[in-house]
Amino acid sequence: MVFLKIPGVNNGHPITVKEIIRIQAISNYSRIYFTNGKVIVVAKVLHWFEDSLPETMFARVHRSHLVNKSFVEKIKGTRSKSLVLYNGDSIAISRRRRVLIG
């Protein structure tokens, strides 16, 4: 099991990475969406998460989104593609990142 320790979050206890659905950038903060429906905002940039999380589990699909690959249900669209996650969230895939996703 893979864990991530985020300073100031969860009383300093590590978070189980497989419980993170996606992370959204909000300026110098990031919004983390969890499988239990919980959403938290942390004072870390998305790049920090990209460097801290395993590449095999997470993909940067847009300038403002990092998604857990295991929660991707499908890719939709022909010209402008987007990911549909298991919880129904739809996230645009940037043109630059489409090649990496498929």
Residue ranges and their predicted role:
Residues M1-G102:
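Basic, polyanion-interacting recognition surfaces, primarily
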